Design a protein with these regions (language model features):
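Catalytic alpha/beta core of large soluble enzyme barrels
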Residues: 111-166
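General structural feature for long, well-ordered alpha-helical segments within catalytic domains
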Residues: 50-53, 84, 88-92, 145, ...
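Short beta-alpha connecting loops at secondary-structure transitions
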Residues: 38, 72-80, 157-162
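Structured mid-domain segments that build the active-site/substrate or prosthetic-cofactor binding neighborhood
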Residues: 1-61, 65
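Flexible helix-coil linker/hinge segments at domain or subdomain boundaries
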Residues: 1-8, 91-105
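Short, glycine/acidic-rich hinge or "gate" loops at secondary-structure transitions
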Residues: 9-26, 67-76, 102-115
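Short secondary-structure subsegments characteristic of cysteine-rich extracellular domains
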Residues: 68-95
Length: 166
């Protein structure tokens, strides 16, 4: 029960170190041309807290709890697995919203939750809240799996929906 809060806090500590480095050591908002031109401002700055690997997390937990029905009950293909994914993201969102982040007045002093898009080099882990590539259910089921997460991500959710293969 304390694993998720622990790892959210460790990730937040890493994010805070990066924010402090950007502002205090690199003095980005004092020296970068975007700031000099007035295009960015420290008062509007916000950090993003990214989620990555939700599908694998859900699938591992379903198997660990003996509820995966031989691999059939997995994220994107099973109501219980999908509900578990939503519960995980809701809890992460609560923890991120509770955690102050310095210099992030653009986000009300907190990080924005972000569902990362991933890159082609990602191996054995799926980006953000996405369903693993190649394991996507039919389009409407795919959308129904991913849509319940969207309201929790002020900085966005990246996904790919295959409407037409051409």
């Amino acid at each position: 029960a304390d694993m998720l809060p622990r790892y959210v806090e460790l990730t937040a500590e890493l994010g805070e170190a990066r924010v402090r480095s950007l502002v205090e050591q690199q003095r980005f908002f004092d020296t970068h041309w975007l700031a000099a031109e007035g295009l960015i401002d420290i008062d509007r700055f916000a950090a993003m807290f990214g989620i990555f690997g939700l599908a694998e997390c859900v699938n591992l937990l379903m198997a660990y709890e003996g509820r995966d029905r031989g691999g059939e009950a997995r994220y994107g293909h099973d109501a219980d697995a999908n509900a578990l994914g939503v519960r995980i993201v809701e809890r992460v969102a609560e923890l991120v919203a509770e955690r102050p982040m310095p210099y992030c007045e653009g986000g009300g002093g907190r990080s924005y939750l972000h569902s990362q898009s991933g890159i082609d080099l990602d191996d054995a882990v799926t980006a953000g809240t996405r369903i693993p590539v190649g394991d996507e259910p039919p389009l409407l089921d795919h959308i129904a799996t991913c849509a319940p997460h969207h309201h929790l991500f002020a900085s966005g959710v990246s996904d790919i929906f295959h409407v037409d293969e051409t």
